[in-house]
Amino acid sequence: MSEMNLCRRNLLKAGAAAAAGIMASAAANAGIPAAKVEKYDEEYDVVIIGSGFAGMACALKAGRAGKKVLMLEKMPVVGGNSAICGGNVACPVNPVQKAQGIKDSRELFIADCLKDGLGLNHVELLSKIVDRCNDTIKFVEDCGAEFVPNHMLFEGGHSVPRSYEIKAGTGSGYIHPMYDQIKKLSNVTVKTRAKFDDFILDGDAVVGVTYREGYRFNAKLQSDDLENKTGKTKTVRAKLGVMLAAGGFSRDIWFRQIQDPRVVPTTDSTNQLGATAGVLVKSLGIGAAPVQLCWLQFLPYTNPREKGFGVSVNFTNHACMDFGIVVDRKTGKRFMDEHACLLYTSDAADE
């Protein structure tokens, strides 16, 4: 290995170590004692951090229940990564399957998940998906989401076709109609360019948050969470609770490499640029216990010549993987089970 490559590797290691140290410090200092807050700028029943699928659903449910809700989104538009994802949703034992004679069951779905998840799944949560997925489909349809009619996708890792395909082709097919419903609720306030900074604690209880209004995300910074100081700080009291729906950290070059050293800073991502670990780090600092953070998901369908998700995925995923074969262009030989789970197909593509 050349001296230049060694120097570059050492520099990346040093940078990651420094960032890890800063993040550890941020986590250790997470949480502001409520006694130090002289006066709250705002007061709501529920404060939601993030505006993707989870945040939107929470805002709608709480808002329709008559609660006063504040939803904070750090980016200039709502939706987060949910707005640009593929939008397909697996729902075992659904009416479309029944009409088409597709035999599915709770046991088969859980077995598929356990196989793909290497047995690390929380089975009680898988059961909850089976119990509630049809309610979820009805919920988003009632909001105005439209699925491809009478159609089930047969996606990798599943034993039978069980996934609904959104007509819009992306998660925007859910986000837009859900947001339209939220805008009808006068008791729900949505703020964009509003970045969560910290929790306000009364003992072990989260009673509010601080955030910055007028924040401007800066993709040119190595770590926007650590370096960006834009915006005016506000304090908000949450009388009933704070909902964390800030999404993943696929664009956080330091945090993701700490979890999986293979994901170097030059590794591209299909996620929107604001998918960083700032909220997660603060949550860890006050004792949150997320599970299996190091199990990152790779997507084997994308084109390295395209930025992010690209458009080639529409062919590779829905045509090649479903109806064709994948071959090594150097040997012309097939080298994977095209219908296997993402973990298997991603590892096969990387070899």
Explain the meaning of each model-derived region.
Residues 31-42:
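A short, basic/flexible loop-to-alpha-helix module at the beginning of a structural domain
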Residues 62:
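Aromatic pocket-lining residues of Rossmann-like dinucleotide-binding sites
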Residues 217-307:
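Glycine-rich loop(s) and the adjacent beta-strand/alpha-helix scaffold that form part
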Residues 344-351:
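Conserved small/polar residues in nucleotide/adenosyl-binding loops
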